[in-house]
UniProtKB/Swiss-Prot annotation:
GO annotation terms (biological process): translation; tRNA 5'-leader removal
UniProt gene name: rpl7ae
GO cellular component: cytoplasm; ribonucleoprotein complex; ribosome
Organism annotation: Halorubrum lacusprofundi (strain ATCC 49239 / DSM 5036 / JCM 8891 / ACAM 34)
Localization, UniProt: Cytoplasm
Protein name: Large ribosomal subunit protein eL8
Keywords carried by this UniProt record: Cytoplasm, Ribonucleoprotein, Ribosomal protein, RNA-binding, rRNA-binding, tRNA processing
Superkingdom in the source lineage: Archaea
Main location: cytoplasm
Length: 120
C-alpha cells in the first residue's frame, strides 16, 4: 500500500465512486488530473476526491489526502490510474479526479462521503 493511502478502500466503495464520477462527468462537473484536483480541493469546491494507488512517484499525489482531510472532503482510493482516467472520460490514465458538481450522482456522492468518514 502506498504511503499516502490512509485506509483500505473496500472494492465495492471504489466501484461506486468510479460510477459516481462517470455520472457526474455526464450530468455535472468534474476536474481531471492532479493539478486541477488540487486546485479544486484548495478552493473547497470538490465534493469527492478519487486518487489512484498506482501513482509513481508517490509524491505526485501525496499531498491530496491530507489537504482534502483539512477541507473536510472525502477521499477514495482506487487501484489504477486507468480506472480514474476512464471514469473521468479520458482515454489515458489520471492520477486523481474531483467531483465538483455531482449532477445526478448527488445522493451517491453524499453516501460515499458518509462511508469514507466511517472508514477513517
Amino acid at each position: 500500500m502506498p504511503v499516502y493511502v490512509d485506509y483500505e478502500t473496500p472494492a465495492d466503495l471504489a466501484e461506486r465512486s468510479l460510477e459516481a464520477l462517470e455520472v457526474a462527468r455526464d450530468t455535472g462537473t468534474v476536474k481531471k488530473g492532479t493539478n486541477e484536483t488540487t486546485k479544486a480541493v484548495e478552493r473547497g469546491n470538490a465534493d469527492l476526491v478519487i486518487v489512484a494507488e498506482d501513482v509513481s512517484p508517490e509524491e505526485i499525489v501525496m499531498h491530496l489526502p491530507e489537504l482534502a482531510e483539512e477541507k473536510g472532503i472525502p477521499v477514495v482510493f482506487v487501484d489504477t490510474q486507468d480506472e480514474v482516467g476512464h471514469a473521468a472520460g479520458l482515454e489515458v490514465g489520471s492520477a486523481a479526479a474531483a467531483v465538483i458538481d455531482a449532477g445526478d450522482a448527488d445522493d451517491d456522492v453524499e453516501d460515499i462521503g458518509e462511508k469514507v468518514a466511517e472508514l477513517r
